[in-house]
Amino acid sequence: MINLIIGERSALSQNLKKKLKNSKIISSNNFLNLKIKSKSNIIINSFYPSKQISKLEDYNEFLNQSLSILAEGLMRLNKKLINKIIYTSSSSIYGLNTQFKHADYGNRKIYAASKLLAENIVTNFSTKNKIPYTIARVFNLYGENDKFSIVSKLIDSNKNKDFFILNNNGSAIRDFISFNQVS
C-alpha cells in the first residue's frame, strides 16, 4: 500500500516521507490530477502557508489553496482505492486569546474558520463514501526544516544574537510536538 502525502512545501510532509515506507509527496496542484492505481492512504497536509496569513491580500487565492483544491481533489479520486484519509488540521480552530490583539487577528480567524470547513469537507466526503478517516489537530509543531514555529524563532534569535520579544509576559502555557513525534 502506498502513502500519498498531499502538500510538498510542508516540513511535516518531508518528515512524514522519511518515516513512512512506500510514500510519495504530491503538490496541491498535482492533487487535482492524481490517479490512484492501487489501494492508498491519503495524507492531506496541504493548506495556505501559515507564515503568509498575516500578509494575506488575495482571499480568492487563499480559498482556492485552502478549500477548493481539497474538495475538487477528493471528488476526482477513485473512492474504491482509498484505504484511509488523514487530514492535518490546526489547533487554531479552538480560537484565539481575545485579550491579545494583533494586526492579523482577522486573518487568523479566517484561517481557523477555513481549517474547520476543510475538516468538515473531509468528514462529509469520508462518511458519504464509507472511507475511514482521521482529523489530526496538531499543536505547535517544530523540527528539521521548520521556518515558522516559535521554537525555530527562538533558535534563530539565539544564533543571530537577537532579542526575542515574548508576548503575554511569558504567561502563556504551550505544548510543543516535534515532526518526529507526529510522524
Language-model features: locations:
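N-terminal Rossmann NAD(P)H-binding glycine-rich loop of SDR-like oxidoreductase domains
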Residues: 1-21
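Conserved catalytic-core motifs of eukaryotic protein kinase domains, centered on the activation segment
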Residues: 53-61, 96-104, 147, 170
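NAD(P)-dependent short-chain dehydrogenase/reductase
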Residues: 123-174, 179-181
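Conserved Rossmann-fold NAD(P)-dependent oxidoreductase catalytic core, especially the SDR/UDP-sugar
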Residues: 71-110
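NAD(P)H-binding glycine-rich loop region in Rossmannoid oxidoreductase-like domains
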Residues: 34-68
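Short-chain dehydrogenase/reductase
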Residues: 63-67, 103, 107-119, 149, ...
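Active-site Tyr-X1-5-Lys
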Residues: 96, 106-134, 159
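SDR active-site strand-loop-helix element
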Residues: 6, 45-49, 85-91, 136-138
